[in-house]
Amino acid sequence: MRLFLLLLICMLSVSSLVAGNREKMSEESFTLSNFTDEERNSVSCPTRGLFDSSGLYVADLSRYTSKDWSYPLRGGKVISPFGGSRKNHQGIDIKTYESDTIYAVFSGRVRFSKPFFGYGNAVVIRHYNGMETLYSHNRKNLVNYGDYVHAGQPIAIIGRTGRATTEHCHFEVRINGRPYNPDLFFDCSCHRLRPVKVIVSSSGKIKIIRLSPKQDTIQSPQKIGRDN
């Protein structure tokens, strides 16, 4: 009887491990493994396998809890909006104090971490939800290519490397390589995640559906799984 129970426990443990590995492999095959040379060496590139069979990408941010996300620069103020006076300003500039810490907004894997032309020191994270975020002009990157990071993890120190006139974080949100206004997803005035469903077509057209938040959205780190 004791031997039978031991065998049963072992079988359950192996089954659980296999299921967990299968979930992880499925998650990684979506966006997070086998980066190409282009993905390793460019801040902007398409995300393979992002769209479903109908050609849509969907992410429901209303279901995220306080542990699933973080504002990139806590206490920061937007000093230059998306677009703005510069026609091709593809993100927002967030200003705070010198040597402040920049945090990963969602969990995911570091796809890029090195200098890139006018961006200076840059970090690009491909997230479990399929989005990518970019953080640049960093004085120092705290993460390396291939690292897995969780929401709220320190990833860089604010700086003014590259084409920058003051210490700040240039922050971008990209879906399939296309930049979208971060204010669609984050209320930057009060540092909150917007409770929205994001729908993007393969042509790049975006639709934002406002929803009621299911739970609180105050910052705190942890990983979530892929949106379906």
Regions found by a protein language model. Give the residues of each.
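Soluble periplasmic/extracytoplasmic beta-strand elements of cell-envelope proteins
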Residues: 77-79, 91-93, 122-124, 134, ...
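Short, glycine/small-residue-enriched coil/turn segments at secondary-structure junctions
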Residues: 63-71, 83-115
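Zn2+-dependent peptidoglycan hydrolase active-site motif and core
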Residues: 89, 104-142
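Conserved, short, structured surface segments that act as functional micro-motifs
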Residues: 127, 147-208, 216
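Solvent-exposed coil/turn segments that connect beta secondary-structure elements
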Residues: 83-85, 97-99, 107, 115, ...
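Polar/charged, compositionally biased leader and regulatory segments
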Residues: 2-6, 15-81, 192-228
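Short, well-structured beta-strand-loop connectors
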Residues: 101-111, 143-158
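Conserved positions in beta-strands of structured domains
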Residues: 79, 95, 109-114, 139, ...
